[in-house]
Amino acid sequence: MKLDQAAKALFLSEFVGAFLLSMRYFFKPKPTLNYPHEKNPQSPRYRGEHALRRYPNGEERCIACKLCEAICPAQAITIEAGPRRNDGTRRTTRYDIDMVKCIYCGFCQEACPVDAIVEGPNAEFSVETREELYYDKDRLLENGARWEREIARNIALDAPYR
């Protein structure tokens, strides 16, 4: 027993083993990303900042069915519908989302029959004041216009699983 301990101490086997382990990890590719400059690929199902979409002809998609308002567990969505138009359809006059209350569950997106409200790919929407987290219809439509290409691609990629 003493001879075994003396050999370990003399040849520094534990030190050499630890050194070799360190060298193995030293030369492997780094798993850490330099975030602002490097980003992980996002899933098509990523739930980020909300957006209201428009049809390709420019007409907004929301038909004021209020399913998203009804299903929201945080009660973060407020909708007011305008009067029926000549063709029998409705559109919203007010569409507000309180992003402070929102829990990003995605129920609003799943409930929408026309894919009007979606949670887009944007994860970087920090603000300086709490009031900026109250999104009105104009802000949501602006988000939809900004992210429409990626949103449409993500919906198409996710279509087989819906």
UniProtKB/Swiss-Prot annotation:
Swiss-Prot/TrEMBL keywords: 4Fe-4S, Cell inner membrane, Cell membrane, Iron, Iron-sulfur, Membrane, Metal-binding, NAD, Quinone, Repeat, Translocase, Ubiquinone
Cofactors named for this entry: [4Fe-4S] cluster
Catalysed conversion reaction: a quinone + NADH + 5 H(+)(in) = a quinol + NAD(+) + 4 H(+)(out)
One GO MF term: 4 iron, 4 sulfur cluster binding
Main location: membrane
Signal peptide interval: none
Family annotation (SUPFAM superfamilies): 4Fe-4S ferredoxins
Record-listed [4Fe-4S] cluster 1 binding positions: C62, C65, C68, C112
EC number of this enzyme: 7.1.1.-
A single GO BP: aerobic respiration
Domain (4Fe-4S ferredoxin-type): residue spans on this chain: 52-82, 93-122
HAMAP family from the UniProt entry: NDH1_NuoI
Family: Belongs to the complex I 23 kDa subunit family.
Subunit structure: NDH-1 is composed of 14 different subunits. Subunits NuoA, H, J, K, L, M, N constitute the membrane sector of the complex.
Protein name: NADH-quinone oxidoreductase subunit I
Originating species: Methylocella silvestris (strain DSM 15510 / CIP 108128 / LMG 27833 / NCIMB 13906 / BL2)
